[in-house]
């Protein structure tokens, strides 16, 4: 995770072959986008809220899920089949626009965050293997509906012409937050899987507060 974060940061400084004038404009645009991101507290809260749900979903559905399955006594073959099913559930992102249109943006965001928090709590204190599998699928489904919406929220918040640069900076910030949350999850999981999952529920709750405060100004 740390290597991915460092790679994302370093990629921003890769030099491209272009005319000197255009290069100076690109550097100026980058610095302007960077300054705007760190001085816009509302945008920063929005990115923090997005990062908390992103990383909780990633950690629980990719790493902690295996510990949950093993704790429930599932075989390696069954774990592999469940991984395939969860991957297929991730394709539900194609329904995000339709669901958002019917329920409204705010309702869907709240539902996704609260569902993620509830799933983390159920996984933390549950011991049933199939219950864990269903929880993982529900978490993947909720995040898949939210994923396209978070991109839309970021786009609406960007005020600069260099939209691609601003989105890249947003991605770096989200990934950097992810490095910190993954260190927390890893440290807690080594001591207690329950503690790691409870912290995931807490981050989802805090993330909802952050993203709602950021959305008020989108």
Model features per residue range: what roles?
Residues 79-102:
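Transmembrane alpha-helices of Major Facilitator/SLC transporters
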Residues 107-122:
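Structural signature of the two symmetry-related core transmembrane helices
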Residues 7-26, 213-218:
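Helix-loop junctions on the cytosolic side of multi-pass membrane transporters
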Residues 15-49:
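Juxtamembrane intracellular "pre-TM" segments in multi-pass secondary transporters
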Residues 144-158:
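Intracellular juxtamembrane helix-capping segments at the cytosolic ends
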Residues 42-86:
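Helix-loop boundary and gating motifs at the non-cytosolic
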Residues 1, 66-73, 98, 178-200:
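Transmembrane alpha-helix termini and helix-breaking/packing motifs in multi-pass membrane transporters
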Residues 1-13, 196-213:
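Symmetry-related core transmembrane helices of the 12-TM Major Facilitator Superfamily/SLC fold
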């Amino acid at each position: 995770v740390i290597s991915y974060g460092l790679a994302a940061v370093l990629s921003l400084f890769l030099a491209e072959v272009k005319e000197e004038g255009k290069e100076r404009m690109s550097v100026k645009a980058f610095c302007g986008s960077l300054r705007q991101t760190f001085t816009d507290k509302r945008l920063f809260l929005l990115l923090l809220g997005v990062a908390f749900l992103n990383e909780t979903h990633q950690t629980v559905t990719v790493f902690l899920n295996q510990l949950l399955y093993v704790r429930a006594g599932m075989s390696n073959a069954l774990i592999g089949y469940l991984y395939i099913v969860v991957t297929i559930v991730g394709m539900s992102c194609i329904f995000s626009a339709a669901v958002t249109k019917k329920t409204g943006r705010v309702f869907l965001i709240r539902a996704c965050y609260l569902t993620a928090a509830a799933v983390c709590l159920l996984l933390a204190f549950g011991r049933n293997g199939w219950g864990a599998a269903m929880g993982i699928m529900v978490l993947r489904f909720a995040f898949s509906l939210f994923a396209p919406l978070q991109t839309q929220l970021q786009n609406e918040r960007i005020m600069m012409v260099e939209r691609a640069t601003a989105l890249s900076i947003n991605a770096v910030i989200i990934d950097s937050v992810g490095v910190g949350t993954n260190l927390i999850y890893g440290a807690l999981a080594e001591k207690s899987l329950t503690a790691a999952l409870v912290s995931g529920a807490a981050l989802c709750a805090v993330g909802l507060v952050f993203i709602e405060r950021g959305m008020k100004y989108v």
